[in-house]
Regions:
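Generic alpha-helical secondary structure signal
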Residues: 11, 60-62, 82, 106
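Short, amphipathic alpha-helical "recognition" segments used to contact nucleic acids or chromatin
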Residues: 35-78
Length: 126
């Protein structure tokens, strides 16, 4: 399994270990400037919402995240607190699609993981 995300506990931030994940439609959709525009970042270039969503995905779904052995309900609660997502952001269909895609990647039922690995290998050959 490719480790797409990590968590920088020193700075309390999500780290994208494999930027190729943003080539996957469901994750690219989280990353648009329009979607990420907010009061703190009117142009959306800092991707504040996208990073909050990735924090939730990592904390709630990733098998290597802190608390991954906890119950799904507790993981959800902790992920909501850690990410700062609102209920409206959590129920957003684009975000929920990214959550489902990440579960597929975790379960190995998606061809995206091997496809990204192949893409990465080809880049290293160049």
């Amino acid at each position: 399994m490719i480790k797409f995300f990590g968590y920088d506990t020193t700075n309390n931030k999500i780290v994208i270990n494999e930027p190729e994940i943003l080539l996957v439609k469901e994750f690219a959709d989280l990353w648009t400037n329009e979607r990420n525009a907010c009061k703190e970042d009117p142009e959306g270039k800092q991707k504040l919402r996208g990073f909050r969503e990735l924090v939730y995905i990592y904390m709630a779904i990733d098998w290597g995240a802190p608390g991954s052995k906890d119950t799904p309900a507790n993981r959800h609660k902790y992920a909501m607190e850690a990410s700062g997502l609102t209920e409206e952001e959590y129920t957003d269909p684009i975000f929920r699609a990214a959550c489902r895609k990440y579960r597929e990647l975790q379960d190995g039922s998606s061809t995206v993981g091997p496809l990204i690995q192949t893409f990465r290998n080809k880049l290293h050959e160049i």
